[in-house]
Amino acid sequence: MIMKISMAMCKQPLPPSPTLDFPPARFGPNMLTLNPYGPKDKVVVIMGATGTGKSRLSVDIATRFRAEIINSDKIQVHQGLDIVTNKITSEESCGVPHHLLGVLPPEADLTAANYCHMANLSIESVLNRGKLPIIVGGSNSYVEALVDDKENKFRSRYDCCFLWVDVALPVLHGFVSERVDKMVESGMVEEVREFFDFSNSDYSRGIKKAIGFPEFDRFFRNEQFLNVEDREELLSKVLEEIKRNTFELACRQREKIERLRKVKKWSIQRVDATPVFTKRRSKMDANVAWERLVAGPSTDTVSRFLLDIASRRPLVEASTAVAAAMERELSRCLVA
């Protein structure tokens, strides 16, 4: 049996852990601008290659603290193709609010600038509700653009805790292959077929850029002319291409994280999840290893990060201004 590593154990009791309450601001809202040297608000960023368990860890952290999750996967921002893009399911999310997940039409383009603006609005919205923002996703270039903006606004306003869920590449390669097979069993071929447009072979925009969509082009255009044996052979080649492209993506994502840590000197806490994946044939053993090696240590890291300095953010409802700004940004992304 193939265990889905990103599945959160919603129904199992969690070990005792701190619950974060943001205290009221010491100086009042009008004094914040007059106290630029005061404590910053806190943001957790979870990074990692595709398939390493980022979503699972984000939910684990969010259910142990008062937190909400902000997606940083530029493909998952779009609506549709939930299997192909491996979006977190309602069951897996355990009731934790997720932002910027499936909010744009499939054909909409999302630039790094668009994403940064939307992410900043989401962070403000989460903080205004007295919650901890957790940014999670595989689009490291967008995360870099958000955190290291040219004006240094992000780092001047927020303290960041960077967690990197890492898996040894040979082990991850095997898991990625199994995950693609599992996606096929879950209906990936049928899902892509519903989106496929014989009159349009442009895969450079929107959700059609997702790995697992353009690879099917030759299959759908030729399957009606093939016998059963040739059809299965072609499908097998398509799936192998998807597996290869997914693993190559994982390698690039890992290289980008290494660059951020070594070249740009980001303080990134690496969490090795390799032993979890080597135990994936036994769900119980894998879950125990996950808690001991990944979720538990990450919870401790976040606890120390949050208890370092109290947040300056008062407990207030999200402002209508933030909500309106988000609506405007979503509308801008719809412009072709």
From Swiss-Prot:
Pfam families: IPPT. The modification Cysteine methyl ester is found at residue 333. GO terms for biological process: cytokinin biosynthetic process. ATP binds at residues 48-55. The keyword Lyase does not apply. Disruption phenotype: No visible phenotype except some decreased root thickening, due the redundancy with other IPTs. Residues 334-336 form a propeptide. Induction: Down-regulated by cytokinins and up-regulated by nitrate, but not by ammonium. The keyword Iron does not apply. Keywords: ATP-binding, Chloroplast, Cytokinin biosynthesis, Cytoplasm, Lipoprotein, Membrane, Methylation, Nucleotide-binding, Nucleus, Plastid, Prenylation, Transferase, Transit peptide. It catalyses: dimethylallyl diphosphate + ADP = N(6)-(dimethylallyl)adenosine 5'-diphosphate + diphosphate; dimethylallyl diphosphate + ATP = N(6)-(dimethylallyl)adenosine 5'-triphosphate + diphosphate. It comes from the Eukaryota. One of its GO terms (molecular function) is AMP dimethylallyltransferase activity. Disulfide bonds: none annotated. InterPro entries: Dimethylallyltransferase (IPR039657), P-loop_NTPase (IPR027417). A lipid is attached at residue 333 (S-farnesyl cysteine). Belongs to the IPP transferase family. Involved in cytokinin biosynthesis. Catalyzes the transfer of an isopentenyl group from dimethylallyl diphosphate (DMAPP) to ATP and ADP. This is Adenylate isopentenyltransferase 3, chloroplastic. It comes from Arabidopsis thaliana.
